[in-house]
Amino acid sequence: MNDLESLLKELDCKTPADEISSERRDPILDFLKMESEYRRQHKIKRLLRLSGVKHVKTLDQFDWHFNLKISKDDILTFVNSPWIENAFNLVLIGDTGLGKSHIASAICYEAILRGYPTACITAFDLVSRIHKAYNPASRIDYYAKVRVLCIDELGYTYHKKEDTDTLFQIISKRNEILPTIVTTNLLCGAPHKRFNAELIVMRRGVSREPTITQLFQ
């Protein structure tokens, strides 16, 4: 299948490629390439608007020299792996100010650029939105089924048991089916092992409060 045939199929055009005369093929091919790129950019803007990513951040913008204990190789290995297709999870653990949210947001942006619906939200905002929703079950279902979910700042506030149960319900529904990224300042109970996640510890001292264990037991 040549470029013209591929683009006609991608854009759901009904005209067969063999019915396009040779002198018209080049300008039509140029137009189809432009249309394909326009649709791709439009999709990215739409996914970004729906994702909750407030400011676009990339891994290239991250200051890897700020803390040399953060493994750039580990992060890039994860990003370049089929983590979305294979539902690989990721837990970023470390103290406040080490860049966990930046890295998580950048990984979410990579998913958006690849055309995947993504939700990036703090744990506090997630449970708040569920509480305020007209149909909480429907909102839980959305976060359980969105292609890529990032729960930021898990453990920065103490949740009620019902909130913890809600977070656990979402994570357990996604486990081994859809990829989940979690950032937290808590290191207790090996949470990455509880839901089959890659663990990257961004060190400068981490809290050892027990709250997070409730989510992964």
Language-model features: where?
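Conserved hydrophobic/aromatic pocket- or pore-lining residues that grip, position, or stack substrates
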Residues: 62, 104, 122
